[in-house]
Amino acid sequence: MNLTIYLITDDKYFKDRDLFNTIEQALQGGVTAVQYRFENKTTRQMYEELVKLRELTRKYNADLVVNDRVDLALAVEADGVHIGKDDLPPEVVRKIVGDKMYIGYTANSLEEVKRAQELPVDYIGFGSIYHTSTKENYKLVGVEALKEAVKISQKPIVCIGGIMPYRVPEVVRAGCRNIAVSSGILGFADVKKAAESIKRAYQETLRMLMLMGKV
């Protein structure tokens, strides 16, 4: 499981873009995992795209995660599946996938992070850290809550929501080591360059923290 720079797809960024070329550019820029999240496609369309993305992510030694759809995740042998509170319960998903893949779970409050410690999930997506244009209905939690989430969770925290290249140092200093990004990469014309900016900011901040003895 390598979710250091975790790209999450979104319908609105692929209206005039080729999915595979765009994802490959992001992978070349340093993305370590890709979550396939689309709503306006048929199951067959999603399956066919995921088959190609599975090949592409393997080429770059990156993880492939499928949002919501456990059936599709199993069908293409994805590395992980991500679920939320309105999806199948984590216990049921674990019974279905066994140890074939890891499970991610969404938490939108510190209380939900605490409850998730008892669930059979492998990482927790926590946010929204900042205001975001990717989702219409979201809960803003902020950086201080992120710091606390990292402290109280025994499971890896993936921070999500409005994370642009210039905000990466702040979330890394807050203790987060896994960064989920959508608009921060896909919102730019040069996707590879945007991914490189995220990666550079991450590595430079981590290096500085190590020099200061804060890691």
From Swiss-Prot:
One of its GO terms (biological process) is thiamine diphosphate biosynthetic process. It comes from the Bacteria. Mg(2+) binds at residues 68, 87. It is an enzyme of class 2 (transferase). GO terms for cellular component: cytoplasm. This is Thiamine-phosphate synthase 1. 4-amino-2-methyl-5-(diphosphooxymethyl)pyrimidine binds at residues 35-39, 67, 106, 135. SUPFAM superfamilies: Thiamin phosphate synthase (SSF51391). Condenses 4-methyl-5-(beta-hydroxyethyl)thiazole monophosphate (THZ-P) and 2-methyl-4-amino-5-hydroxymethyl pyrimidine pyrophosphate (HMP-PP) to form thiamine monophosphate (TMP). Pathway: Cofactor biosynthesis; thiamine diphosphate biosynthesis; thiamine phosphate from 4-amino-2-methyl-5-diphosphomethylpyrimidine and 4-methyl-5-(2-phosphoethyl)-thiazole: step 1/1. Keywords: Magnesium, Metal-binding, Thiamine biosynthesis, Transferase. Transmembrane segments: none annotated. Its EC number is 2.5.1.3. The keyword Coiled coil does not apply. It comes from Aquifex aeolicus (strain VF5). 2-[(2R,5Z)-2-carboxy-4-methylthiazol-5(2H)-ylidene]ethyl phosphate binds at residues 132-134, 162. InterPro entries: Aldolase_TIM (IPR013785), ThiamineP_synth_sf (IPR036206), ThiamineP_synth_TenI (IPR022998), TMP_synthase (IPR034291).
